[in-house]
């Protein structure tokens, strides 16, 4: 049994970036993977306090909130796909808090050798989608995640109103392609390495 983690950064319930994430997770469900999908719109996660003397090297964050569910999912998963709406040409603040909080467990490197993909949705063309995708992938690389593209990079889309993305068959298809690519790489890694982690 293999496991995939989806993190939807949008503060909107059923936002466009979350819809694309669900499409990206479809291939995993079809192949019998176990899926965990965290919606930050339903969670309470505080920003990092930079209290390094309390978390550095301990693999434990002192903040008591819903982030502990995500911490538990990092070592559990074989793959991770993260989606974000674009705010001020970058990652939304809700997702940024999650990415920053990885610092508290960085020494444990729970995502090293996992396979990842990224999705970003903005209101307009050239609205910061590529910057957002790159920010997610840069974070993944710093965690030791093997980043996998969709057709080109991650999946980027333009959608200004709730549910707009459902009218864009091409983007929905691209999200599924991203999911398939992440799945294929993760399965090949598992076949070649077994339970061992990449160096």
Model-derived regions, located:
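N-terminal beta1-alpha1-beta2 submodule of the flavodoxin-like/Rossmannoid cofactor-binding fold
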Residues: 1-105, 152-199
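Short, glycine-/small-residue-rich phosphate/pyrophosphate-handling segment
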Residues: 93, 107-153
């Amino acid at each position: 049994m293999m496991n995939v983690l989806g993190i939807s950064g949008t503060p909107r319930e059923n936002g466009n970036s979350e819809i694309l994430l669900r499409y990206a997770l479809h291939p995993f469900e079809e192949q019998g993977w176990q899926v965990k999908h965290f919606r930050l719109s339903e969670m309470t996660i505080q920003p990092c306090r930079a209290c390094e003397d309390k978390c550095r090297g301990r693999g434990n964050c002192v903040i008591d909130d819903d982030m502990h569910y995500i911490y538990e999912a990092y070592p559990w998963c074989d793959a991770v796909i993260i989606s974000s709406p674009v705010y001020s040409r970058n990652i939304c603040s809700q997702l940024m808090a999650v990415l920053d909080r990885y610092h508290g467990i960085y020494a444990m490197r729970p995502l090293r050798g996992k396979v990842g993909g990224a999705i970003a949705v903005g209101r307009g063309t050239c609205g910061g989608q590529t910057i957002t995708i790159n920010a997610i992938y840069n974070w993944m690389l710093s965690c030791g995640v093997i980043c996998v593209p969709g057709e080109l990079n991650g999946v980027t889309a333009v959608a200004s109103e709730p549910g707009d993305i459902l009218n864009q068959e091409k983007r929905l298809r691209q999200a599924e392609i991203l999911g398939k690519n992440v799945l294929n790489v993760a399965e090949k890694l598992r076949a070649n390495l077994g339970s061992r982690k990449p160096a």
